[in-house]
Regions:
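Structural beta-sheet core signal
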Residues: 184, 208-210, 243, 288, ...
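A conserved beta-strand->alpha-helix junction
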Residues: 229-255, 345-346
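RNA-binding accessory domains that recognize and position tRNA/RNA substrates
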Residues: 1-183, 193-240, 308, 356-361, ...
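The feature marks non-catalytic terminal segments
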Residues: 341-393
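Active-site adenylate/phosphate-handling loop in enzymes that bind or generate adenylated species
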Residues: 133-135, 172-179, 250-251, 256-333, ...
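Conserved G/P- and acidic residue-centered "switch" motifs that form tight phosphate/ATP-binding loops
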Residues: 189
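A short alpha-helix-loop-beta-strand transition element characteristic
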Residues: 334-342
Length: 393
Protein backbone atom coordinates (compact mmCIF):
# COMPACT_ATOMS: atom_id res chain seq x y z
CA UNK A 1 0.00 0.00 0.00
CA UNK A 2 2.95 2.34 0.48
CA UNK A 3 4.07 4.31 -2.55
CA UNK A 4 6.72 6.30 -0.68
CA UNK A 5 9.24 6.08 2.15
CA UNK A 6 10.24 9.05 4.27
CA UNK A 7 13.95 8.95 5.14
CA UNK A 8 14.97 10.46 8.46
CA UNK A 9 18.50 11.63 9.18
CA UNK A 10 20.05 13.24 12.26
CA UNK A 11 23.64 14.52 12.12
CA UNK A 12 23.24 15.92 8.62
CA UNK A 13 20.48 18.21 9.87
CA UNK A 14 22.89 20.13 12.11
CA UNK A 15 25.35 20.89 9.31
CA UNK A 16 25.63 24.51 8.23
CA UNK A 17 25.88 25.97 4.76
CA UNK A 18 27.30 22.73 3.34
CA UNK A 19 24.37 20.62 4.55
CA UNK A 20 23.23 20.16 0.96
CA UNK A 21 26.49 18.32 0.18
CA UNK A 22 25.73 15.72 2.84
CA UNK A 23 22.11 15.44 1.68
CA UNK A 24 23.26 14.95 -1.91
CA UNK A 25 25.72 12.28 -0.76
CA UNK A 26 22.93 10.51 1.12
CA UNK A 27 20.67 10.64 -1.95
CA UNK A 28 23.50 9.13 -4.00
CA UNK A 29 24.05 6.33 -1.47
CA UNK A 30 20.31 5.57 -1.35
CA UNK A 31 20.17 5.35 -5.14
CA UNK A 32 23.14 2.98 -5.09
CA UNK A 33 21.57 0.79 -2.39
CA UNK A 34 18.25 0.56 -4.22
CA UNK A 35 19.97 -1.07 -7.19
CA UNK A 36 19.86 -4.24 -5.06
CA UNK A 37 16.04 -4.13 -4.97
CA UNK A 38 13.64 -4.98 -7.78
CA UNK A 39 11.62 -2.05 -9.09
CA UNK A 40 11.96 1.57 -10.15
CA UNK A 41 12.46 4.33 -7.59
CA UNK A 42 12.78 8.09 -7.45
CA UNK A 43 14.86 9.54 -4.62
CA UNK A 44 14.17 13.23 -4.04
CA UNK A 45 14.77 16.04 -1.57
CA UNK A 46 11.90 18.24 -0.47
CA UNK A 47 11.73 20.78 2.37
CA UNK A 48 14.54 19.26 4.41
CA UNK A 49 13.25 15.74 3.87
CA UNK A 50 14.35 12.88 1.62
CA UNK A 51 11.72 10.65 0.03
CA UNK A 52 11.93 7.39 -1.88
CA UNK A 53 8.98 7.17 -4.28
CA UNK A 54 8.17 3.76 -5.78
CA UNK A 55 7.42 3.96 -9.50
CA UNK A 56 6.59 0.29 -10.04
CA UNK A 57 5.81 -2.90 -8.16
CA UNK A 58 8.42 -3.62 -5.52
CA UNK A 59 9.26 -5.97 -2.66
CA UNK A 60 8.77 -4.10 0.62
CA UNK A 61 11.28 -6.20 2.58
CA UNK A 62 13.91 -5.84 -0.16
CA UNK A 63 13.63 -2.06 -0.12
CA UNK A 64 13.77 -1.84 3.67
CA UNK A 65 16.80 -4.17 3.89
CA UNK A 66 18.63 -2.11 1.25
CA UNK A 67 17.93 1.15 3.08
CA UNK A 68 18.99 -0.32 6.45
CA UNK A 69 22.54 -0.59 5.05
CA UNK A 70 22.83 3.12 4.17
CA UNK A 71 24.85 5.15 6.65
CA UNK A 72 23.29 8.52 7.39
CA UNK A 73 19.76 7.13 7.73
CA UNK A 74 18.35 6.99 11.26
CA UNK A 75 14.78 6.11 10.34
CA UNK A 76 12.86 4.56 7.43
CA UNK A 77 9.18 5.47 7.47
CA UNK A 78 6.65 3.89 5.08
CA UNK A 79 4.52 6.98 4.46
CA UNK A 80 1.20 7.93 2.88
CA UNK A 81 1.37 11.30 1.09
CA UNK A 82 -1.93 13.19 0.89
CA UNK A 83 -3.14 16.34 -0.81
CA UNK A 84 -4.49 18.99 1.56
CA UNK A 85 -8.26 18.80 1.11
CA UNK A 86 -9.22 19.97 4.58
CA UNK A 87 -9.22 18.34 8.00
CA UNK A 88 -12.32 16.17 7.50
CA UNK A 89 -10.83 14.59 4.37
CA UNK A 90 -7.54 14.09 6.21
CA UNK A 91 -9.38 12.32 9.04
CA UNK A 92 -11.08 10.01 6.51
CA UNK A 93 -7.69 9.12 5.04
CA UNK A 94 -6.19 8.45 8.47
CA UNK A 95 -9.12 6.14 9.35
CA UNK A 96 -8.65 4.32 6.02
CA UNK A 97 -4.92 4.03 6.79
CA UNK A 98 -5.64 2.49 10.21
CA UNK A 99 -8.08 0.02 8.62
CA UNK A 100 -5.39 -1.27 6.27
CA UNK A 101 -2.40 -1.26 8.62
CA UNK A 102 -3.98 -2.26 11.95
CA UNK A 103 -6.64 -4.97 11.54
CA UNK A 104 -6.65 -5.50 15.32
CA UNK A 105 -7.91 -2.24 16.80
CA UNK A 106 -7.11 -3.06 20.44
CA UNK A 107 -4.18 -0.69 20.93
CA UNK A 108 -3.26 2.50 22.75
CA UNK A 109 -2.22 5.48 20.65
CA UNK A 110 -1.31 9.11 20.44
CA UNK A 111 -1.39 11.57 17.56
CA UNK A 112 1.80 13.54 16.94
CA UNK A 113 1.13 16.40 14.52
CA UNK A 114 3.80 18.72 13.19
CA UNK A 115 2.76 21.82 11.28
CA UNK A 116 5.77 22.58 9.07
CA UNK A 117 3.50 24.59 6.75
CA UNK A 118 2.42 27.46 8.97
CA UNK A 119 -0.54 28.57 6.83
CA UNK A 120 -2.48 25.44 7.79
CA UNK A 121 -5.57 26.68 9.68
CA UNK A 122 -5.15 24.43 12.74
CA UNK A 123 -2.36 24.42 15.33
CA UNK A 124 -0.47 21.17 15.99
CA UNK A 125 -2.18 20.63 19.36
CA UNK A 126 -5.59 21.19 17.78
CA UNK A 127 -4.82 18.56 15.14
CA UNK A 128 -3.71 16.11 17.85
CA UNK A 129 -6.94 16.53 19.83
CA UNK A 130 -9.31 16.57 16.86
CA UNK A 131 -7.70 13.57 15.14
CA UNK A 132 -7.64 11.65 18.42
CA UNK A 133 -11.40 12.18 18.74
CA UNK A 134 -11.97 10.97 15.17
CA UNK A 135 -9.98 7.78 15.83
CA UNK A 136 -11.79 7.11 19.11
CA UNK A 137 -15.17 7.64 17.42
CA UNK A 138 -14.26 5.21 14.63
CA UNK A 139 -12.65 2.63 16.92
CA UNK A 140 -14.04 2.79 20.49
CA UNK A 141 -11.88 -0.18 21.50
CA UNK A 142 -8.74 1.98 21.16
CA UNK A 143 -7.43 4.17 23.98
CA UNK A 144 -5.34 7.31 24.11
CA UNK A 145 -2.02 7.07 25.98
CA UNK A 146 0.20 10.08 25.44
CA UNK A 147 3.06 8.74 27.60
CA UNK A 148 3.56 5.11 26.52
CA UNK A 149 1.42 4.52 23.42
CA UNK A 150 1.63 1.31 21.43
CA UNK A 151 1.12 3.27 18.20
CA UNK A 152 2.06 6.85 17.34
CA UNK A 153 0.27 8.36 14.36
CA UNK A 154 2.60 11.00 12.93
CA UNK A 155 1.00 13.71 10.82
CA UNK A 156 3.35 16.22 9.19
CA UNK A 157 1.72 19.16 7.43
CA UNK A 158 3.98 19.94 4.47
CA UNK A 159 3.45 20.59 0.76
CA UNK A 160 1.76 17.22 0.98
CA UNK A 161 0.54 15.82 4.27
CA UNK A 162 2.71 12.95 5.54
CA UNK A 163 1.00 10.20 7.53
CA UNK A 164 3.08 7.39 9.05
CA UNK A 165 3.21 5.25 12.17
CA UNK A 166 6.21 2.98 11.60
CA UNK A 167 9.81 4.11 12.02
CA UNK A 168 12.30 1.38 11.12
CA UNK A 169 15.73 2.16 12.64
CA UNK A 170 18.56 2.87 10.21
CA UNK A 171 22.28 2.50 10.96
CA UNK A 172 22.87 6.21 11.67
CA UNK A 173 26.24 7.82 11.05
CA UNK A 174 27.26 9.88 8.04
CA UNK A 175 26.89 9.13 4.31
CA UNK A 176 29.87 7.21 2.95
CA UNK A 177 32.12 9.44 0.87
CA UNK A 178 31.75 12.58 2.97
CA UNK A 179 34.88 12.10 5.10
CA UNK A 180 37.70 10.95 2.85
CA UNK A 181 39.20 7.51 2.26
CA UNK A 182 41.28 5.10 4.35
CA UNK A 183 42.95 1.69 4.03
CA UNK A 184 41.66 -1.13 6.25
CA UNK A 185 44.02 -3.91 7.34
CA UNK A 186 41.56 -6.76 6.92
CA UNK A 187 42.21 -10.19 8.42
CA UNK A 188 39.96 -13.19 8.78
CA UNK A 189 39.11 -12.40 12.40
CA UNK A 190 36.21 -10.75 14.18
CA UNK A 191 37.72 -7.33 14.82
CA UNK A 192 38.88 -5.87 11.51
CA UNK A 193 35.55 -6.20 9.62
CA UNK A 194 33.86 -4.43 12.54
CA UNK A 195 36.52 -1.71 12.42
CA UNK A 196 35.79 -1.25 8.71
CA UNK A 197 32.08 -1.01 9.42
CA UNK A 198 32.60 1.52 12.21
CA UNK A 199 34.89 3.81 10.22
CA UNK A 200 32.57 3.66 7.18
CA UNK A 201 29.75 4.71 9.52
CA UNK A 202 31.60 8.02 9.94
CA UNK A 203 31.42 8.66 6.21
CA UNK A 204 34.83 7.22 5.26
CA UNK A 205 35.29 5.33 1.99
CA UNK A 206 37.51 2.28 2.44
CA UNK A 207 39.86 0.01 0.55
CA UNK A 208 41.48 -3.00 2.23
CA UNK A 209 44.76 -4.90 2.47
CA UNK A 210 44.93 -8.60 3.37
CA UNK A 211 48.20 -10.45 4.07
CA UNK A 212 48.16 -13.96 2.61
CA UNK A 213 50.83 -16.55 3.49
CA UNK A 214 50.52 -19.60 1.23
CA UNK A 215 50.99 -22.50 1.78
CA UNK A 216 50.62 -21.78 5.51
CA UNK A 217 47.29 -20.07 4.86
CA UNK A 218 44.89 -21.76 2.47
CA UNK A 219 42.76 -20.52 -0.41
CA UNK A 220 39.79 -21.03 1.90
CA UNK A 221 41.34 -18.49 4.29
CA UNK A 222 41.66 -16.05 1.41
CA UNK A 223 38.06 -16.67 0.31
CA UNK A 224 36.94 -16.08 3.88
CA UNK A 225 38.50 -12.60 3.77
CA UNK A 226 36.89 -11.91 0.40
CA UNK A 227 33.53 -12.90 1.91
CA UNK A 228 34.14 -10.58 4.88
CA UNK A 229 35.01 -7.75 2.50
CA UNK A 230 31.68 -8.34 0.74
CA UNK A 231 29.85 -8.07 4.06
CA UNK A 232 31.58 -4.77 4.89
CA UNK A 233 30.95 -3.50 1.34
CA UNK A 234 27.18 -3.85 1.87
CA UNK A 235 27.57 -0.81 4.11
CA UNK A 236 30.71 0.92 2.86
CA UNK A 237 30.21 0.62 -0.88
CA UNK A 238 32.82 -0.83 -3.28
CA UNK A 239 36.16 -1.98 -1.83
CA UNK A 240 39.42 -2.70 -3.64
CA UNK A 241 40.94 -5.60 -1.68
CA UNK A 242 44.74 -5.82 -1.98
CA UNK A 243 45.90 -9.41 -1.41
CA UNK A 244 49.59 -9.31 -0.48
CA UNK A 245 51.76 -12.44 -0.53
CA UNK A 246 53.53 -12.14 2.82
CA UNK A 247 55.08 -15.62 3.04
CA UNK A 248 58.70 -14.84 2.14
CA UNK A 249 58.79 -11.75 4.36
CA UNK A 250 57.32 -13.69 7.26
CA UNK A 251 59.75 -16.60 6.86
CA UNK A 252 62.76 -14.29 6.62
CA UNK A 253 61.78 -12.40 9.78
CA UNK A 254 61.21 -15.74 11.52
CA UNK A 255 64.71 -16.88 10.55
CA UNK A 256 66.54 -13.66 11.45
CA UNK A 257 64.82 -12.15 14.49
CA UNK A 258 64.28 -13.20 18.12
CA UNK A 259 60.99 -15.06 18.30
CA UNK A 260 59.61 -13.01 21.17
CA UNK A 261 59.70 -9.98 18.84
CA UNK A 262 58.24 -11.72 15.78
CA UNK A 263 54.72 -10.35 16.11
CA UNK A 264 55.80 -6.73 16.55
CA UNK A 265 58.34 -6.79 13.72
CA UNK A 266 55.94 -8.56 11.34
CA UNK A 267 53.22 -6.05 12.13
CA UNK A 268 55.62 -3.16 11.48
CA UNK A 269 56.28 -4.50 7.99
CA UNK A 270 52.57 -5.07 7.43
CA UNK A 271 51.94 -1.44 8.33
CA UNK A 272 54.65 -0.31 5.91
CA UNK A 273 53.08 -2.29 3.07
CA UNK A 274 49.55 -1.18 3.92
CA UNK A 275 50.72 2.43 3.96
CA UNK A 276 52.30 1.99 0.53
CA UNK A 277 48.99 0.83 -0.94
CA UNK A 278 47.14 3.52 1.01
CA UNK A 279 49.24 6.27 -0.54
CA UNK A 280 48.94 4.66 -3.96
CA UNK A 281 45.15 4.79 -3.63
CA UNK A 282 44.98 8.34 -2.22
CA UNK A 283 43.92 7.21 1.26
CA UNK A 284 44.31 9.57 4.20
CA UNK A 285 45.03 6.96 6.86
CA UNK A 286 45.13 3.32 7.93
CA UNK A 287 42.41 1.46 9.87
CA UNK A 288 43.01 -1.49 12.17
CA UNK A 289 40.79 -3.56 14.44
CA UNK A 290 43.09 -3.23 17.44
CA UNK A 291 41.75 -2.76 20.97
CA UNK A 292 43.98 -1.88 23.91
CA UNK A 293 45.06 -4.92 25.87
CA UNK A 294 43.07 -7.49 23.90
CA UNK A 295 46.20 -9.46 22.91
CA UNK A 296 49.93 -9.06 23.54
CA UNK A 297 50.49 -7.11 20.31
CA UNK A 298 47.89 -4.56 21.40
CA UNK A 299 49.42 -3.13 24.55
CA UNK A 300 50.04 0.62 24.54
CA UNK A 301 53.76 -0.01 24.02
CA UNK A 302 53.13 -2.45 21.15
CA UNK A 303 50.74 -0.07 19.40
CA UNK A 304 53.31 2.72 19.73
CA UNK A 305 55.92 0.44 18.16
CA UNK A 306 53.74 -0.30 15.13
CA UNK A 307 52.73 3.36 14.83
CA UNK A 308 56.35 4.42 14.59
CA UNK A 309 56.80 3.11 11.04
CA UNK A 310 53.77 5.00 9.67
CA UNK A 311 53.82 8.52 8.28
CA UNK A 312 50.02 8.72 8.03
CA UNK A 313 47.44 8.48 10.82
CA UNK A 314 46.36 5.07 12.10
CA UNK A 315 42.68 4.97 13.06
CA UNK A 316 41.54 2.34 15.56
CA UNK A 317 37.75 2.66 15.92
CA UNK A 318 37.60 -0.28 18.38
CA UNK A 319 40.36 0.98 20.67
CA UNK A 320 38.17 1.17 23.79
CA UNK A 321 35.79 -1.71 23.04
CA UNK A 322 35.80 -4.98 24.93
CA UNK A 323 35.50 -8.25 23.01
CA UNK A 324 31.79 -8.78 23.68
CA UNK A 325 30.95 -5.32 22.35
CA UNK A 326 32.85 -6.13 19.16
CA UNK A 327 31.15 -9.53 18.84
CA UNK A 328 27.73 -7.88 19.24
CA UNK A 329 28.40 -5.56 16.29
CA UNK A 330 29.88 -8.44 14.27
CA UNK A 331 26.67 -10.41 14.79
CA UNK A 332 24.53 -7.38 13.92
CA UNK A 333 26.21 -6.98 10.52
CA UNK A 334 26.16 -10.75 9.86
CA UNK A 335 29.95 -11.06 9.87
CA UNK A 336 30.40 -13.20 12.99
CA UNK A 337 29.65 -16.64 11.53
CA UNK A 338 32.10 -16.00 8.69
CA UNK A 339 34.76 -14.58 11.02
CA UNK A 340 34.82 -17.70 13.20
CA UNK A 341 35.32 -20.16 10.33
CA UNK A 342 38.43 -22.18 11.30
CA UNK A 343 40.86 -21.00 8.61
CA UNK A 344 44.13 -19.53 9.90
CA UNK A 345 45.44 -16.20 8.70
CA UNK A 346 49.07 -15.10 8.67
CA UNK A 347 48.77 -13.48 12.12
CA UNK A 348 48.08 -16.85 13.74
CA UNK A 349 51.09 -18.73 12.34
CA UNK A 350 54.68 -18.43 13.59
CA UNK A 351 53.36 -17.20 16.93
CA UNK A 352 55.96 -16.93 19.71
CA UNK A 353 55.33 -18.79 22.96
CA UNK A 354 56.27 -15.71 24.99
CA UNK A 355 55.84 -12.59 22.83
CA UNK A 356 57.16 -9.32 24.18
CA UNK A 357 54.42 -7.04 25.55
CA UNK A 358 56.57 -3.95 26.15
CA UNK A 359 58.85 -3.79 23.12
CA UNK A 360 62.01 -1.70 23.39
CA UNK A 361 62.31 0.34 20.20
CA UNK A 362 66.12 0.39 20.34
CA UNK A 363 66.14 -3.41 20.40
CA UNK A 364 63.56 -3.56 17.59
CA UNK A 365 65.64 -1.18 15.46
CA UNK A 366 68.78 -3.27 15.98
CA UNK A 367 66.95 -6.47 15.03
CA UNK A 368 65.50 -4.86 11.91
CA UNK A 369 68.98 -3.73 10.83
CA UNK A 370 69.94 -7.42 10.70
CA UNK A 371 67.37 -7.91 7.97
CA UNK A 372 69.59 -5.74 5.71
CA UNK A 373 68.76 -5.12 2.07
CA UNK A 374 67.10 -8.48 1.51
CA UNK A 375 63.94 -7.37 3.31
CA UNK A 376 63.66 -4.38 0.97
CA UNK A 377 63.77 -6.69 -2.04
CA UNK A 378 61.14 -8.96 -0.49
CA UNK A 379 58.93 -5.95 0.25
CA UNK A 380 59.24 -4.76 -3.35
CA UNK A 381 58.35 -8.23 -4.61
CA UNK A 382 55.24 -8.21 -2.41
CA UNK A 383 54.27 -4.84 -3.88
CA UNK A 384 54.90 -5.97 -7.46
CA UNK A 385 52.86 -9.18 -7.09
CA UNK A 386 49.87 -7.78 -5.20
CA UNK A 387 46.48 -9.06 -6.37
CA UNK A 388 43.66 -6.50 -6.36
CA UNK A 389 40.13 -7.88 -6.07
CA UNK A 390 37.28 -5.44 -6.67
CA UNK A 391 34.40 -6.02 -4.27
CA UNK A 392 31.09 -4.48 -5.31
CA UNK A 393 29.08 -2.73 -2.63
Amino acid sequence: MYKSFLIKYAEIAIKGKNRYLFEDALVSQINHALKKAEGEFLVRKEQGRIYVDTLSDYDYDEVVEALKCVFGIVGICPVVLLEDEGFDKLAEEVIAYIDKVYPDKHFTFKVNARRARKNYPMESMEINAAMGEKILDAYPETKVDVHHPQVVFNIEIRAKINVYSTIIPGPGGMPVGTNGKAMLLLSGGIDSPVAGYMIAKRGVTIDATYFHAPPYTSERAKQKVVDLAKIVAKYSGPINLHVVNFTDIQLYIYEQCPHEELTIIMRRYMMKLAEHFAKENKCLGLITGESIGQVTSQTMQSLAATNEVCTMPVYRPLIGFDKQEIVTISEKIDAYETSILPYEDCCTIFVAKHPVTKPNLNVIHNDERKLSEKIDALMQEAIDTVEVIHIEG
